[in-house]
Amino acid sequence: MKEKQKQQNMIHLGTHGEDYGNWMSNPVLYTIGGLLVVTGAVASLASTVFHVTVLSGLALIAAISLLLLLCWCGWIRRQYAFGGGGMMERVHHTVLSYLDFDGQGQLLDVGCGSGALSIRAALIWPDAQVTGIDYWGAAYGYGQIMCERNAAGEGVAARCQFQHGDANHLNFPDESFDAVVSNYVYHNINRADKRALLMETLRVLKKGGVFALNDEMKPRMYGDVEEFAQELRDMGYQEVRLVDTAEEV
């Protein structure tokens, strides 16, 4: 465990020009910026052209609020960024620190995004073959080509493969992987039974395999998570732990 922590501490992604994107995506900033311009224009026109004081005041308040929101989102983006505040990297570090993997065999990353977690796993465990799957919707600007370029830049392209996939129905046979990871994915899948998503992920895990799945384990999404953890133990999973990682990142 100490050796793995040492390896993790030595890994810094994105130092060769790789693009890992950001959880605070550009479309969000562009949308807020666009609304700011519109409300600012309305405030100006209402005041100087139409002389509608109430509308001008309301639009000005909206514009100031949007400006503050844009500044906050920009700060959050900086905190998340690789090479910035490093929040994304710290989260990935924490998730993999709980994966008791010997580094031999196949590892699956469900919802790989820009490939950062998959690539970090490949760097930590040089004998592992890593597969990353994602639906790659438009919200974050991630994609398969981005993942493959990042893996090549970090020198692990030969051991990483990325493919389009759906966490609801993984396109792999039962017991295909020795380790499974996922970070902050399931809560984003609308109208899905979150427990069913976890069970689909665990379906492809080999007997004796290990997993580390990080998500918002809110009762409205997962129900009683302690009860669910016990159900997994009753099904034969030898060690199931619920860990609050909020203080670790």
Protein language model regions, located:
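A short acidic, Gly/Pro-enriched loop at the edge of an enzyme's catalytic core
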Residues: N168-V180
